[in-house]
């Protein structure tokens, strides 16, 4: 099953690369193998031309890659999602312009999305009248410290669909490739709408 997800993820990475959502080898993507292992894109690889050989097996509990090759810098964020959400089988981390800029414009620790029909692309959302909170965390080169802050947040506040890293990008997930891809595309559309609203509304 995970082998099929990995093959689908490679196709999704090519789609992400074509959209310019992971420029200059940025971003990283993974699939869960089981409760112990995941497969994560290798550091420094162009996402538009990845193959299955560009993914490393990583232990979820330790962030270690038995092969000795270097997984992506944000490995600890992927494994955190898999530990926090047993239902998550795919994690996508992208560096889109909309996510990067909006995360800097919004000064609070939460981006509130409300009033958009496309909120319904997110699993469990049924109305544009609902408010969808997307957590924002200050960026940190110490990924272990960043992951610890996110884990602490998740103990007391809902963390659904994804989160933003200020001035960095978006991390989102899903139970399968289709859900993760839909939620990435939906959030990216909503971020663009919110940026335009803030630009044009008095």
UniProtKB/Swiss-Prot annotation:
A biological process from GO: pentose catabolic process
One term of GO molecular function: zinc ion binding
Reactions the enzyme catalyzes: 5-(methylsulfanyl)-D-ribulose 1-phosphate = 5-methylsulfanyl-2,3-dioxopentyl phosphate + H2O
Pfam family, one: Aldolase_II
Co-factor(s): Zn(2+)
This enzyme's EC code(s): 4.2.1.109
Cofactor mode of binding and number, as noted: Binds 1 zinc ion per subunit.
Chain residues that bind Zn(2+): 93, 95
SMART domains linked: Aldolase_II
GO cellular component, as recorded: cytosol
Assigned protein family: Belongs to the aldolase class II family. MtnB subfamily.
PANTHER family, sorted: 3-OXO-TETRONATE 4-PHOSPHATE DECARBOXYLASE-RELATED (PTHR22789:SF0), FUCULOSE PHOSPHATE ALDOLASE (PTHR22789)
Protein name per UniProt: Methylthioribulose-1-phosphate dehydratase
Lineage: Bacteria, Pseudomonadati, Pseudomonadota, Gammaproteobacteria, Enterobacterales
Encoding gene per record: mtnB
């Amino acid at each position: 099953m995970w082998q099929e997800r990995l093959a689908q993820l490679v196709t999704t990475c090519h789609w992400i690369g074509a959209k310019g959502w992971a420029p200059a080898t940025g971003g990283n993507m993974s699939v869960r193998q089981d409760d112990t292992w995941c497969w994560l894109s290798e550091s420094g690889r162009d996402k538009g031309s990845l193959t299955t050989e560009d993914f490393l097996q990583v232990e979820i509990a330790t962030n270690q890659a038995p092969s000795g090759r270097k997984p992506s810098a944000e490995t600890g964020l992927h494994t955190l999602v898999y530990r926090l959400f047993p239902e998550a089988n795919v994690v996508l981390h992208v560096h889109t312009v909309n996510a990067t800029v909006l995360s800097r414009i919004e000064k609070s620790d939460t981006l509130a999305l409300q009033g958009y029909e496309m909120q319904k692309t997110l699993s469990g959302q049924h109305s544009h009248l609902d408010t969808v909170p997307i957590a924002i965390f200050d960026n940190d080169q110490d990924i272990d410290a960043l992951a610890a802050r996110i884990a602490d947040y998740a103990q007391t506040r809902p963390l659904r669909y994804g989160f933003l890293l200020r001035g960095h990008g978006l991390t989102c997930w899903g139970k399968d490739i289709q859900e993760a891809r839909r939620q990435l595309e939906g959030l990216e559309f909503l971020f663009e709408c919110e940026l335009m609203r803030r630009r044009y509304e008095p």
